[in-house]
Amino acid sequence: MYKRQAPILPIDSEHSAIFQCLVGEQSPIRRLIITCSGGAFRDLPCEKLADVTVEQALRHPQWEMGAKITIDSSTLVNKGFEVIEAHWLFGTPVEKITVLLHPQSIVHSMVEFEDGAIKAQLGTPDMRMPISFALMYPRRATRPGERFDFMAHPQLTFAGVDRAKYPALEIACECLRRRGTAACTMNGANEVAVAAFLGRKCAWLDIVRAIEYALGRASFAAAPTLGDYAEANDEARRLAAEYLAL
């Protein structure tokens, strides 16, 4: 990318939104604001999370997605990975990346500039929009049937994320601060834990616990090679399986 000056066009809705907000801008940014639906359990009290079922976790309030990413959305692991992704795509330090709860999933992300102005990208929660943007860039696809009805969405609300309810978000941010193989370890452990949850071999809360277990015991390479990443992934999977007694 750097050698050839070739742009990377993101298709994740949040990062596509940030990219679109940055087009034509030359001034430094103050922060990136990534929005978050809150997943299947955004309205569920913390004390009830211990007993949630696979079926409940798969009922995403806004998006229709595969099982793995829907579970990641319910734990906010995916949002943590999106923070990491935003850092590497846009060169933004974690301290300048904010995550806001936005239940309507209409504002896909925002960028705040040094003068206090904020640009946002809005649209219905439909992955065809960011995908078509990436495919057609720098032009836009013609979609005559796509019309946003503001009257159908009279309220757009935002709130901070409950870090106690969703510890995975801060875990991911800490992995980004540590760099090295930390995020790889988190990813490997999460994949094993999510598969176990979907297979009804562990509880929903065990997903993040398995991640914490792996991160607390895994070896760490500060300047990893490709081989180090492969080893970190294997070790994380083994540690997660060990914690879950698989």
Language-model-detected regions and their locations in the chain:
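Catalytic, metal-anchored helix/loop core of enzyme active sites in primary metabolism
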Residues: 3-246
